[in-house]
């Protein structure tokens, strides 16, 4: 029966009772046969039996008496097969009735052993019983033995002989089943609760664990004896297919072999029991049956795995679920889809921001059904068949139709690896020749694509809703800002940058300098007549500009000094945007007065006195885009980008810039600088030989000398570059390369790192223009190799980090507008010593204020409570000298399974307030994970400085923080607030002890002797502050201080890593991740509630569990916050589907089944797995309950049932603007 997934609220998993398994089944599989080798038809009662599993051919019974759909539902009287669709072979199950009960390996072998906990027996003893090595007492009767006591065969016989009837012992799964059935769960639970009040140490831990499992059985209606199976389900045959290969051989799923072994052994056991065979033989057969079932469920979990041909272990049912190739990750979370294709990409400079070039053959294939429909509608083909034939023959009509079919039908382009959401964007297809897809040059940065052979995948959204979402939400022209920091991600690069740089360069003394034009058109005529050059500095009458250009009245009466190139550059900007004359932020308000002269003033004198204005570099072009986006939003910005791209390509071509050997200048001072360095090194070596300095000091000084020499050469080199040198222009404009590349070309390569990461003190004095000696070349190879292998490792590590981050935060969605939280977070600039890591401006921009902020001088209110801090407000706050602002934060959000709009603030990708339904958790994970590949892999070594520990940085440091591991070189933290009274050094055992006297108690800490202190004697220290240098362990910090302090510390530490590498990631993304690590608490004392001590639970669940106790005036439970690493936090989620698809699949499912867990389907992953629309964005329930409302005779706009309907964006006609 088909289930409509969109109708159900939650999904439960539980243990299956034997009757349940029989009720699923359509018949018992009695024989190990699969198919007949001659007829290739399924054997009767075998693993592929058509009577049990349904017909192999659609609507046809096995013997062929009934064929066609009109007999649907009839069971054939000859062969007993029901006439129905062959699809039922994917859903109908069978079963095997076992001759002896068998334990389920998941519940016996998992850690902790669930059976062992219920029975209070060790897994070792269980194994002996199950595999027939020992007997266990079931009923002692009068015998002098305990229940559940183990005994050998000899002891058993002895007791049986003596005590006969009352005494009962057994072995194998039967004995276990009887013991489990005899457990009185309620009594056992009461006893354990009593025991918990006295027990301590290991005993207590064991009792808590047992109570946990027993309570789980009590609450879930599962019976412990169901962990032992009498019946085994047989999964549908089409899920374990058998296919014929060429040459008559068969390939079969491993499961068929495993089922065959079970059936063979089961049938043999039945026969032996019928024959009344000797006990030892029956026992052996039962053990073999147990092992066969173990192998079927989880091959290799116990003992050696059962191997198939070629000694390859067979894949059991558990393996079908596990890992990247398992059911969860391969088929449920990521499926292959139709209407998709992939091809090599090539640059398409002729495209608009919202277009991509689609090769004709791909277009025909992807839009085939659409073309067929259109051909038949237009009567160009009589029916679908002839339309198909026309397409195959590439008829002329097809091309005419194709143009119209793809018009306004957006497609999605994706490039792997998809590190952030901009890895999939929508475009309107434009037909191109050839076989390569054409990509707009400006979106390459978001995709991290280049055109050296990269391939991309294309997908066609089919339904109207999908097309609407692609157009309104995913069109590439709308993705101007990066979600990680709100800065433009589509900025011109390479050719486009150098073209605009060349265009806006000024040069003194160019032809036509000092001419004054009455309008831009006049300047254009002069340029076309070669009277002036782009670089010529000229004057222009300000009054000739349109009235909407922001000039003051005074400026309009004067003449503005600019360059011809800048006049042309400004034409691409919106008409009311300020004239950009210099690369400065102030120019965004209007042009500075210093660029104007009165009519009649001598322009040549002015030009002689003023210096050249810098050309526009890459960073400034980015600033222009950001400013235009802020003022005019998406449409205007994407049009500007296209104009800037075309202008850049045009002018870089015109400039004729090339790079040649002659542009790499030789530095005349180089030999003298090297000579000087050599003599300094000689002096240092002499000092070492005389024993005046140690070897490590000598090494340090030598490396310092060479580093300094390289720096001098670098400075001299920059001085010697002409501004017109193409290599200098390329670097200065930000088009390609940086200064160190050019120092290696023309200066010296400098010191290289050896294989161990230590710097080799012999420098490479040559540069690439002179060429390296063999020795220098060899020294250089170490670094190059390390670089290559580091990059490969980094990519894998970074990808895995992103996966864990996504998993822990995937259910964080903006769920409401406000949650009335009364707590905020006070933020200041993040400092590292004296340097600013992240300024206050960055931290408060786009957030909501928790408290009103007043100007300390004038007492004027700058921003009110719950008001957004935008750029202007943030500037005011910083300029007023305010150092700390309390903002609404994700840390203090009280929204369950997500955050509220006010806690999160601005959506960085749009620059607007975030909308309800935004999947901020996934965006946060991608924003932290995506730059992961740019972080370094190495730990920095402080070059032999005494007491300087190696500091972990880059990717390893981020992992250390988010996995809540004990950091390397951990600092001790003070557990009290007080004064440091004594610091006592103890050279004998190389330690020093620090005594801190607090108000109530005194603490002493022992530290290594070499450690660097952060405080001296007599200094005040606060609780939770580090005594010595080094990273703090966040778990210790949480124990000593509160959640918020710990969260803020972790945020600061992660920001330090990213900002030091020049990567900007917004605080709010990191806040989302850290909050997920701290959303659990551990129950310390259950009070008078039903909670169990030691239980790990969500804060919201804990509050709910405490409510009844508080209302009735009973003692509530107490708990303390727990910091979980992201892997652990992802596995501890309330959704078993999400956890099982992440890691440790069998463990998660075992636990969920025993507890009878219910998955509330609140996150994204669990909904993707069951194929339900995800509850984020347009899939949110609120946005899906839209009804038409009738007003009079006309149907008005659809209206949502919920309060938050106002947050639904109006579908403004984004697309139309691009067609203009």
Swiss-Prot record:
EC nos: 2.7.7.6
Source taxon at top rank: Bacteria
Molecular function per GO: DNA binding; DNA-directed RNA polymerase activity; magnesium ion binding; zinc ion binding
One BP annotation, GO: DNA-templated transcription
Family matches, as SMART domains: RPOLA_N
Compositionally biased region (Basic and acidic residues): 1207-1220
Disulphide-bonded residues: none
Entry's cofactor comment: Binds 1 Mg(2+) ion per subunit. Binds 1 Zn(2+) ion per subunit; 2 are expected compared to other organisms.
A Pfam cross-reference name: RNA_pol_Rpb1_5
List of residues binding Mg(2+): 450, 452, 454
PANTHER family referenced in this protein's UniProt entry, alphabetically: DNA-DIRECTED RNA POLYMERASE (PTHR19376), DNA-DIRECTED RNA POLYMERASE SUBUNIT BETA (PTHR19376:SF54)
Protein known as: DNA-directed RNA polymerase subunit beta'
Organism expressing this protein natively: Leuconostoc mesenteroides subsp. mesenteroides (strain ATCC 8293 / DSM 20343 / BCRC 11652 / CCM 1803 / JCM 6124 / NCDO 523 / NBRC 100496 / NCIMB 8023 / NCTC 12954 / NRRL B-1118 / 37Y)
Lineage, top ranks: Bacteria, Bacillati, Bacillota, Bacilli, Lactobacillales
């Amino acid at each position: 029966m088909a289930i409509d997934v969109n109708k159900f609220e939650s999904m439960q998993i539980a243990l299956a009772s034997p009757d349940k398994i029989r009720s699923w089944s359509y018949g018992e599989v009695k024989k190990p046969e699969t198919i007949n080798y001659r007829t290739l038809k399924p054997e009767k009662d075998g693993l592929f039996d058509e009577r049990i599993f349904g017909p192999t051919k659609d609507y046809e019974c096995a013997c062929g008496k009934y064929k066609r759909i009109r007999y649907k539902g009839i069971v054939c009287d000859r062969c007993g097969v029901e006439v129905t669709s062959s699809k039922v072979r994917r859903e109908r199950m069978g079963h095997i009735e076992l001759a002896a009960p068998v334990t389920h390996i998941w519940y016996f072998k998992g850690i902790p052993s669930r059976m062992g906990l219920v029975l209070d027996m060790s897994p070792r003893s269980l194994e002996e019983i199950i595999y027939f090595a020992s007997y266990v007492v079931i009923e002692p009767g009068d015998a002098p033995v305990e229940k559940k006591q183990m005994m050998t065969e000899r002891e058993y016989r002895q007791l049986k002989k003596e005590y006969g009837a009352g005494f009962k012992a057994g072995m194998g799964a039967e004995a276990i089943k009887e013991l489990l059935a005899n457990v009185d769960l309620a009594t056992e639970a009461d006893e354990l609760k009593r025991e918990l009040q006295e027990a301590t140490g290991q005993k207590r831990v064991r009792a808590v664990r047992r109570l946990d499992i027993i309570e789980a059985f009590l609450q879930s209606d599962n019976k412990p004896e169901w962990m032992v199976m009498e019946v085994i389900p047989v999964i549908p045959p089409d899920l374990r297919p058998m296919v014929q290969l060429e040459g008559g051989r068969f390939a079969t799923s491993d499961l068929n072999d495993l089922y065959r072994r079970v059936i063979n052994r089961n049938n043999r056991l039945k026969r032996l029991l019928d024959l009344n065979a000797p006990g030892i033989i029956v026992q052996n057969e039962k053990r073999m049956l147990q092992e066969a079932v173990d192998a079927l469920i989880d091959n290799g979990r116990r003992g050696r795995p059962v191997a198939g041909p070629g000694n390859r272990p067979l894949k059991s049912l558990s393996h079908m679920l596990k890992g990247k190739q398992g059911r969860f990750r391969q088929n449920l979370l990521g499926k292959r889809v139709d209407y998709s294709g992939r091809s090599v990409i090539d640059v398409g400079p002729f495209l608009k921001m919202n277009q991509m070039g689609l090769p004709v053959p791909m277009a025909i294939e992807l839009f085939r059904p659409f073309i067929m429909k259109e051909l038949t509608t237009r009567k160009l083909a009589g029916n679908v068949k002839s339309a198909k034939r026309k397409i195959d023959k590439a008829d002329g009509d097809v091309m005419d139709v194709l143009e119209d079919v793809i018009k306004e039908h957006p497609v999605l382009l994706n490039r792997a690896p998809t590190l952030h959401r901009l890895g999939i964007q929508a475009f309107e297809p434009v037909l191109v020749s050839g076989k390569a897809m054409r990509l707009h040059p400006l979106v390459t940065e978001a995709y991290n694509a280049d055109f050296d052979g990269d391939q991309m995948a294309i997908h066609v959204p089919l339904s109207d809703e999908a097309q609407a979402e692609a157009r309104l939400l995913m069109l590439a022209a709308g993705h101007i800002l990066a979600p990680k920091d709100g800065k433009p991600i589509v900025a011109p690069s390479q050719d486009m940058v150098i073209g605009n740089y060349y265009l806006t360069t000024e040069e003194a003394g160019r032809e036509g300098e000092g001419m004054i034009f009455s309008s831009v058109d006049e300047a254009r005529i002069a340029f076309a007549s070669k009277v002036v050059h782009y670089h010529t500095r000229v004057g222009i009458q300000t009054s000739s500009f349109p009235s909407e250009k922001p000039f003051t009245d005074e400026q309009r009466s004067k003449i503005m000094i600019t360059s011809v190139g800048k006049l042309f550059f400004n034409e691409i900007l919106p008409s009311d945007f300020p004239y950009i004359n210099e690369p400065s932020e102030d120019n965004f308000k209007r042009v500075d007065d210093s660029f104007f002269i009165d009519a009649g003033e001598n322009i040549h004198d002015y030009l002689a006195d003023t210096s050249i204005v810098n050309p526009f570099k890459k960073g400034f072009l980015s600033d222009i885009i950001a400013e235009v986006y802020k003022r005019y939003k998406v449409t205007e910005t994407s049009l500007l980008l296209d104009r800037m791209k075309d202008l850049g390509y045009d002018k870089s071509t015109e400039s004729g810039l090339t790079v040649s050997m002659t542009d790499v200048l030789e530095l005349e001072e180089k030999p003298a600088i090297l000579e000087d360095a050599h003599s300094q090194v000689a002096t240092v070596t002499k000092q070492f030989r005389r024993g005046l300095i140690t070897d490590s000091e000598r090494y340090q000084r030598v490396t310092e000398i060479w580093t300094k020499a390289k720096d001098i050469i670098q400075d001299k080199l920059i001085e010697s570059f002409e501004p017109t040198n193409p290599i200098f222009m390329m670097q200065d404009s930000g088009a390609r390369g940086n200064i160190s590349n050019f120092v290696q070309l023309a200066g010296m390569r400098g010191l290289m790192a050896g294989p161990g990461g230590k710097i080799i003190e012999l420098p490479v004095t040559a540069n690439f223009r002179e060429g390296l000696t063999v020795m220098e070349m060899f020294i250089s190879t170490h670094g190059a190799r390390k670089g290559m292998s580091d990059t490969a490792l980094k990519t894998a590590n970074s990808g895995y980090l992103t996966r864990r981050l996504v998993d822990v935060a995937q259910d964080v969605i903006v769920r409401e507008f406000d949650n009335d939280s009364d707590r905020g977070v006070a933020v200041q600039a993040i400092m590292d010593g004296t340097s600013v890591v992240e300024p206050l401006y960055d931290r408060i921009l786009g957030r909501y204020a928790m408290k009103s902020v007043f100007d300390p001088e004038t007492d004027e209110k700058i921003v009110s409570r719950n008001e957004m801090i935008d750029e202007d407000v943030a500037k005011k706050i910083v300029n007023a000298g305010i150092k700390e602002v309390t903002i609404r934060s994700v840390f203090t959000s009280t929204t369950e399974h997500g955050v509220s709009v006010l806690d999160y603030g601005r959506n960085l990708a749009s620059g607007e307030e975030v909308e309800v339904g935004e999947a901020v958790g996934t965006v946060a994970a991608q924003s932290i994970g995506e730059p992961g590949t740019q972080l370094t892999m190495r730990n920095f070594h402080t070059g032999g400085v005494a007491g300087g520990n190696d500091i972990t940085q880059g990717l390893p440091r981020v992992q250390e923080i988010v996995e809540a591991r004990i950091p390397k070189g951990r600092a001790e933290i003070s557990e009290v607030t007080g004064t440091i009274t004594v610091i006592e050094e103890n050279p004998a055992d190389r330690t020093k002890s620090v005594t801190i006297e607090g108000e109530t108690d005194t603490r002493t800490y022992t530290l290594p002797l070499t450690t660097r202190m952060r405080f001296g004697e007599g200094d005040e220290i606060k609780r939770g502050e580090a005594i010595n240098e080094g990273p703090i362990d966040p778990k210790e910090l949480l124990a000593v201080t509160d959640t918020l302090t710990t969260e803020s510390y972790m945020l600061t530490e992660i920001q330090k890593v990213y900002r030091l590498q020049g990567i900007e990631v917004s605080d709010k993304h990191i806040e989302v991740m850290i909050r997920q690590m701290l959303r659990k608490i551990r129950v310390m004392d259950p009070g008078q509630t039903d909670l169990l001590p030691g239980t790990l639970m969500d804060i919201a669940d804990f509050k709910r569990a405490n409510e009844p106790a508080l209302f009735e005036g009973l003692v509530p439970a107490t708990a303390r916050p727990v910091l979980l690493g992201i892997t652990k936090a992802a596995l501890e989620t309330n959704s078993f589907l999400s956890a099982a698809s992440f890691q440790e699949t069998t463990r998660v499912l075992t636990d969920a089944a025993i507890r009878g867990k219910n998955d509330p389907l609140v996150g994204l992953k669990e909904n993707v797995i069951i194929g339900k629309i995800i509850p984020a964005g347009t899939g949110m329930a609120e946005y899906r309950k839209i009804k038409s409302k009738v007003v009079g005779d006309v149907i008005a706009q659809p209206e949502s049932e919920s309060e938050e309907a106002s947050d639904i964006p109006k579908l403004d006609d984004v697309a139309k603007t691009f067609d203009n």
